[in-house]
């Protein structure tokens, strides 16, 4: 198995077609197909499902791809350091639920480690995708929360994927809404108070479930609901529609002036915000630094 073969497999997985990948790699389709078959035979697994509509990764293939990507990244770092005679690149990646503070902490990380050359990765995505990204080593760690509502199922999924969860801090749920919202003057808001207004939830794709939801109490039926996949859209809908969402309450005011506020939710629940890693994985220095930055956002009185 060669580095070149791994690069071929990464390209095929990226474009989803052996024909298109062969064109981009400037080799013949039969040569590429043979290379993939040789790699599959040597690894003892089937990497791709093949069909008339194209190819997709198998479960074994997705895991293989994660390791292959790591090998290629390490090879590039080796070449950068000893072939080009340039300073080595600092690399680090995070997949996170849609939190402002995780993005802010990432900015501070880049400021600290962003030297002349670096390759950082930050992805806001759905809960299940975070687990996939960490499992397949697309990123170094993932940020998500556990609660009384989702903990049993989430811990089971985390364990099945050979991952481990470590809590960073806990936070009481808050309602995010615009400062002119009819409920903005209340010291505490109940789920009943929110009933007349549109609820905003983040899309979870094929894994739409209360257990993978990024919002607490998403299992409670509502008459008005909007699902989005962009944090900017959520802010716009709060401002334009008197909509709301439920989250941790950590939302720096400078991101939208004084327009968005958070009000404590009366319900008895706690968000345990933490990170997931592969089992037996050691954190890199950028990883340790990133977690330090995240801990700075811990609520004073959760």
Regions found by a protein language model. Name each.
Residues 10-28:
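Short helix-boundary/capping micro-motifs
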Residues 40-57:
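A short LG(V/I)-centered, amphipathic sequence patch enriched
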Residues 42-43, 64-86, 101:
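Alpha-helical linker/hinge and terminal dimerization helices associated
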Residues 89-153, 228:
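Central regulatory/effector-binding core of bacterial HTH transcription factors
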Residues 102-108, 151, 190-191, 195-219, ...:
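Secondary-structure junction motif
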Residues 135-138, 145, 204-261:
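Hydrophobic hinge/microswitch elements
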Residues 157-173, 177-199:
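Flexible hinge/capping segments at coil-to-helix
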Residues 160-166, 171, 232-282:
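Beta-alpha-beta core module
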């Amino acid at each position: 198995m060669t580095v070149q073969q791994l690069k071929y497999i990464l390209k095929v997985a990226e474009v989803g077609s052996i024909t298109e990948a062969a064109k981009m790699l400037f080799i013949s389709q039969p040569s590429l197909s043979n290379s993939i078959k040789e790699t599959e035979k040597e690894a003892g697994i089937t990497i791709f499902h093949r069909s008339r509509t194209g190819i997709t990764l198998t479960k074994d293939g997705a895991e293989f791809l994660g390791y292959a990507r790591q090998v290629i990244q390490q090879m590039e770092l080796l070449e950068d350091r000893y072939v080009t005679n340039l300073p080595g690149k600092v690399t680090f990646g995070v997949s996170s639920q849609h939190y402002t503070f995780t993005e802010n902490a990432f900015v501070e990380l880049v400021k600290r480690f962003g030297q002349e050359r670096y390759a950082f990765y930050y992805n806001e995505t759905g809960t299940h995708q975070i687990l996939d990204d960490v499992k397949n080593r697309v990123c170094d760690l993932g940020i998500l929360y556990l609660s009384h509502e989702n903990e049993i199922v989430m811990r089971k999924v985390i364990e099945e994927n050979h991952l481990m969860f470590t809590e960073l801090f806990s936070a009481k749920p808050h309602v995010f809404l615009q400062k002119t919202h009819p409920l903005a003057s209340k010291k505490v808001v109940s789920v009943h108070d929110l009933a007349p207004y549109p609820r905003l939830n983040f899309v979870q794709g094929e894994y739409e479930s209360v257990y993978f939801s990024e919002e607490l109490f998403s299992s409670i039926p509502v008459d008005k609901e909007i699902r989005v996949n962009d944090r900017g859209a959520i802010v716009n809908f709060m401002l334009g529609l008197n909509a709301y969402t439920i989250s941790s309450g950590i939302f720096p005011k400078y991101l939208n002036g004084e327009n968005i506020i958070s009000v404590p939710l009366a319900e008895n629940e706690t968000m345990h915000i933490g990170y997931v890693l592969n089992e037996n994985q050691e954190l890199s220095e950028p990883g340790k630094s990133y977690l330090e930055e995240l801990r700075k956002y811990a609520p004073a009185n959760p």
